[in-house]
Amino acid sequence: MKVLFIVQGEGRGHLTQAITMEELLRRNGHEVVEVLVGKSNSRCLPGFFNRSIQAPVKRFLSPNFLPTPANKRASLARSVAYNLTRLPVYLKSMHYIHRRIEESGAELVINFYELLTGMTYLFFRPSVPQISVGHQYLFLHRDFEFPGKNGFHLWLLRLFTRLTCIGAREKLALSFREMEDDEEAYVRVVPPLLRREVLSCEGTEGDYLHGYMVNSGFGENILHW
């Protein structure tokens, strides 16, 4: 089967998942014909992605979140205002995505949480079936419980997640925790996509802490802690 990837370029998680998925598909005799990655002025592809992915990589301009001045979370107001001014650019990107889906010879599209994939399937109705992959699709599972947070923000998060997977035949929710599939929501819970290098690593004792921060602004909090 010929597969086309569309990947949200914000952060590292979706890029890593795409690398692992390509390895998995190739081992099982399938072909990844192209990888389309969303980009913005603040994003550049990390070296590990360019070194690891084998299929041709192409870029398109896509929405991104602007941080607060403290760079600890996304600023909703700034992000909405900025992306509204760039709607004509994103429309061109949707035209491009649709053209690549139809011209690449792909028999399946795998979407890694890219908003413009959902918008392309909403407005252009590509003929190629789509599957959406990401841990965020667990938010749509009937049994998933959010921690106590602002209800409006959670509603927006679920709305954004639903927009990314418009047109998807199935949503693969990546999770370390085993859960039953939510057939009504077309959500299948599957293990996370981890790179082989991660599985082969061995921990060592030392005077250090190892962690991952989504926004660099949290570094100050860690230092104080």
Task: Please describe what each predicted stretch is.
Residues 43-44, 109-124:
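An aromatic- and histidine-rich active-site surface loop
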Residues 127-189:
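Active-site-proximal region of nucleotide-activated glycan assembly enzymes
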Residues 15-25:
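Short amphipathic alpha-helix
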Residues 9, 27-86:
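Conserved nucleotide-sugar phosphate-binding/catalytic loop shared by glycosyltransferases and other
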Residues 174-178, 186-225:
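Active-site donor-nucleotide binding/catalytic segment of nucleotide-sugar enzymes
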